[in-house]
Amino acid sequence: MKADSYRFDGSGKCRLDKLATNSKADGIDKEKILAKTTENLQKMAALQDAFYADGREGLIFVLQAMDAAGKDSTIKHVMSGLNPQGVQVTSFKQPNSEELKHDFLWRVNKALPARGSIAIFNRSYYEDVLVVQLHDLQKGYQMAPRVLEQD
């Protein structure tokens, strides 16, 4: 995909109805992409087996995007080649009452993968800081003072 064709350069008014949103303009061949995806899924499965056998590290995939950007679909389709026994998916939504009793990284630490395993984070702790401030949850959520500082 050629990202430049979707980038607004700021030289004038931004008219969303005039911006191209269709990848067909880039000459993308869906059949080639599907074939490559199938090939990559097979490679991912083999790599996961080797990663598990090695057992020295854990691996985290972080998917960070706006709502309805396709994070769940990416997990469902792109990660479908992985063995589900070695993968844990965690969605970080607004902190619940239990999570509010701990520091802001507690729930992330809880979701870290074991050695040889893979964790997929739907959103990340970066957004966690933003959500807490946006919804004014700082009083009940233990965050480092430097995180709450404003410029």
Q: Which residues does each PLM region occupy?
A:
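Glycine-rich phosphate-binding loop of ATP-dependent small-molecule kinases
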Residues: M1-D151
